[in-house]
Structure formats: structure tokens, C-alpha cells
Amino acid sequence: MKNNYFPTDYQEFIHLSRYARWLGSRRETWAETVERYFDFMDNTLQERFGHEIPNRDELEEAVLSLQVMPSMRALMTSGLALERDNTAGYNCSYIPVDSPRAFDEILYVLMCGTGVGFSAERQYASNLPTVNEHFEETETTIIVQDSKAGWARGLRELIACLYAGQVPKWDLSRLRPAGARLKTFGGRSSGPAPLDDLLKFTVNLFKNAAGRQLSPLECHDLVCKIASVIVVGGVRRSALISLSDLNSNRMRVAKSGEWFRDYPHRGLANNSAVYSERPDMNTFLKEWYSLYESKSGERGIFNRESAKNKVASLRRRDPDHEFGTNPCSEIILR
């Protein structure tokens, strides 16, 4: 169905493949997508705050004609998906990996379609518990429910067991098969295989860390593996940026050599070193020579001092907080 609102075929393709909901036998038109967005916002504002959108017709026409755009994440999820969880309305987020709960929270947020910036810096990873020295197979079975919360809960329960030195079984029989339509969120199910792969990966990673804390690189790898299970219609759908210590050589070379063969999950994140002050010339050259040698263009730069200066100029938050960033990192640009 040709849509006359878009100047190019590419724009029309992006709408149909990313934002148009399935209506039983066809996808939404652009006009129907925009109407769904405004219906949801109008109804929500009236129900919760007794507020009606002024000049709705004028605003709707501005979006239809591509003069302005609302939150594209909300444009995609407006309706039952966004009504169930407002996480689905956010484009991006940030979390330091300083607690075991960070892993299942990242899984849940990514499944809601929200990008995740995370820090695997030593100052955060050092807060994680020590992994048990010994592991034993148990009869405990984690029953994973067929929902975003169910997947996240399953990972949380597995990690809790592993910290206690127990290797449980898991039951994924309740998950819908690959290709089944996701009526609320849209797209099609990946089936249980990606989650099963993640749970096995997690067990092996913890066994290799027996008797010590997870290293920053292991935290990074686990988050990247988590992102790899976010599959919609056979397409990977997750956005990550990983922040790491400037002096971490293991993170510096994480995408060097044939990493794409041995550690393909690392391709799910862009990697950036955190600069908290001007580095000495030796450190600077070492980092940039590594970037050149990697042929991957990484690691990039996240200037934490610049982020703090930006916050100070806005006078709305504590500028001494150790800020991270969202995957695009445009939030600190002037």
C-alpha cells in the first residue's frame, strides 16, 4: 500500500518495518500510526490528569506531514504495550553494573525496546559478590514464564543460584515457539533457543569465575550476551554502550583480532573508555594505537568530566555524581 506522506521509499520502509503495527491482515498506514499515538496520549492524559490535548488536530497534522516528531519509541509502542509498562516509552537508559540485579534489569529494559548504556568499570564491578568456590548440580528447576518479566526473573533466579554454588535446571516449555506473533508488543517470538543459550553461557561464565568476583570484562561479556537474545522477527534489536576504565587493557583489546569469531556477542555493544581527566601522553598514545590496531574503531571516548560540567551548567542535578551515558551519548553534547 503506497503511502503518500513519505517523500522517499526508504522513509516508508522504515515506518512499515519499525513503527507500523499489524492489524490482522495488513500493517498500519502512517495516518493510523499517528492516530494511535495521539489516541493513547489523549486518553492517558484525560484519565490520569483530567487534561485534554489542546489543538490536537494541528499537532497531529504536524506529525503527519513530518514537520515534527514525537518520541519514536512511544510512537511504536503506544497502546496496550505502553499502557502495561512505561519503560517501553523510553528510548534509552543507563546503569552501572554494581549489583547482580543489574543483569536481569538490563534484560528486561532491552526487551522493552529501550537502549542501555552500562558501566563495567572496576569501581562498580568491585561491588559484586564473590562467586562460590564450588558448584554442584541441583534438582532445583527454574520455571520461566512466557513474558518479559518471566525471562528477566528466570535470569535473576539463575544468577542467585550460581552465587550460592548451585547449578539448577530450567524449564522453558511455557515459552511460545519461534515465529509466534507477539500481539501486544508487535513482531514475532524468537522462541526459547536464545534464552537457553544465554542461561548456558551464564553458567559457564560463573564456573570460570569460581572463588572470585566477576571481572569487568566478564560483566561486559554477560551484558553483551544478554543483548544478543533480543530478537524480533529474526533481527537483533538492542542498543548498548559499554563504559570501561581507561587503564583496562582487557577491555581495550576486547574487539581486537578475530573477536568476531571467538566472542561474537561483543558485537552487540559499542565500547568507550572513560576519561575523568586529561591523560598523560603515554596513556593517550597507547589507547589510540590500540584503536588503530583493532581495525574496529574502538574504544571510543566518554568524557566524564565534560558530563559533569554539562550537569553543572544546567543546575538541576548533583555535578559530583559519577555519570554514565545512553548508547548514543548525545546527551552530553552542547
Language model: regions and residue ranges:
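Extended catalytic cores of very large enzyme megasubunits
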Residues: 1-334
